[in-house]
């Protein structure tokens, strides 16, 4: 089968950082689906692994943690899917990814794709939707009020892939006021269109901007990037006993500013359930099914903003360049082989 992989960490400026390769079709485990991949999306996780991971000698690493496609075969223990089902999923970081014509993925972290979306539009959603949903409802527990805090959440990085779906989930499923950060006119317009109630600039003082809104101290904050830079400001502006979640990988993170307010800090890693095979691993498939339902009801929308035709090394390198630039609005997807 066709695939795209890498055999050594190279900068995205090197045309050999991703390579077109041929691999045997994957073998299925008991609960696996064999999916014919029709579309993929690129996330910061792809970029980080490509730039830092060294595969074993003579081996290729296949990235890709967003896909939509068609089930071509099922393992002997599969219970909920059949050949021909159109599905979408993020997968798990310790198995070969979706930059391949065929991918094996456990059925418990898969759902049928939204009927109203094509494969490219659907492929933009899984990783970011799971990240946003788990952050809001499993980590921050936004349905549990913070005593004395305003029903408001500050989202640092509102226009990226995770931020774009976070805003929609909050607007659709809660009555929480959304304060999103954006620093350019196009990103500000994007987050307002998605449903942000207030937009502030993350290059300026956050506590001063939040105070000027006149809505009180927010109960929650969600930092999607540069958390080491923003954490002291989040500690200052949040209500006592508020909650902060983050998804990035700071080299050093000083949490001491949180102590005097008893602010809790929550890490979200979308791969935890599948990587650790937790008892509630099937929740990821359930979340994706709920997201698909909300999309088909017109209450959520794909965050795909750019589609590249053709899943190959050259096009994936282009997509990696867009993501590495750090100013993506929405998601970039690739469709077709």
Model-inferred region functions:
Residues 229-300, 336-337:
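Glycine-rich phosphate-binding loop and adjacent beta-alpha segment
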Residues 98-99, 182-190, 252-255:
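Short, glycine/polar-rich helix-capping loops at beta-to-alpha or helix-loop-helix junctions
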Residues 123-204:
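Mid-domain Rossmann-like dinucleotide-binding core that forms the NAD(H)/NADP(H) cofactor-binding site
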Residues 85-86, 102, 243:
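Residue-level marker of beta-strand positions
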Residues 94-107:
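A structural motif shared across PLP-dependent enzymes of the aminotransferase-like
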Residues 24-41, 51-96:
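Glycine-rich beta-strand-centered segment in the early N-terminal region that forms part
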Residues 205-216:
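Short amphipathic alpha-helix with an adjacent loop that forms part of the alpha/beta core around
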Residues 299-306, 317-337:
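C-terminal capping/lid region of NAD(P)-dependent oxidoreductase domains
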């Amino acid at each position: 089968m066709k695939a795209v992989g890498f055999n050594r960490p190279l900068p995205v400026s090197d045309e050999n950082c991703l390579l077109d390769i041929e691999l045997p079709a994957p073998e299925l485990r008991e609960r696996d689906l064999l999916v014919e991949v029709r579309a993929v999306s690129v996330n910061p996780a792809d970029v980080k692994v490509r730039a830092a991971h060294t595969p074993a000698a003579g081996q290729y690493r296949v990235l890709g943690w967003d896909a939509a496609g068609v089930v071509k075969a099922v393992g002997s223990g599969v219970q909920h899917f059949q050949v021909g089902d159109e599905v979408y999923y993020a997968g798990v970081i310790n198995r070969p990814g979706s930059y391949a014509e065929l991918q094996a993925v456990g059925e418990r972290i898969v759902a049928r794709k939204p009927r109203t979306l094509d494969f490219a539009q659907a492929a933009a959603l899984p990783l970011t939707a799971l990240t946003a949903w788990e952050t809001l409802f499993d980590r921050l527990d936004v349905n549990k009020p913070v005593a004395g805090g305003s029903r408001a959440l500050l989202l640092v990085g509102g226009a990226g892939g995770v931020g774009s779906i976070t805003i929609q989930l909050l607007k659709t499923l809660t009555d929480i006021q959304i304060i999103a950060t954006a620093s350019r006119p196009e990103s500000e317009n994007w987050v307002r269109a998605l449903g942000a109630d207030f937009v502030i600039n993350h290059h300026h003082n956050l506590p001063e901007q939040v105070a000027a809104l006149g809505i009180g101290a927010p109960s929650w904050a969600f930092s999607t990037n540069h958390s080491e830079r923003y954490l002291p400001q989040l500690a200052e502006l949040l209500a006592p006993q508020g909650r902060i979640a983050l998804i990035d990988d700071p080299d050093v993170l000083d949490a001491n500013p949180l102590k005097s307010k008893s602010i809790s800090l929550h890490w979200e890693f979308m791969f935890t359930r599948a990587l650790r095979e937790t008892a509630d691993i099937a929740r990821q498939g359930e979340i994706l099914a709920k997201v698909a339902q909300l999309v088909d009801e017109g209450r959520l929308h794909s965050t795909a903003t750019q589609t590249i035709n053709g899943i190959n090394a050259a096009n994936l390198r282009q997509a990696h360049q867009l993501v590495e630039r750090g100013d993506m609005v929405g998601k970039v997807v690739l469709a077709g082989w």
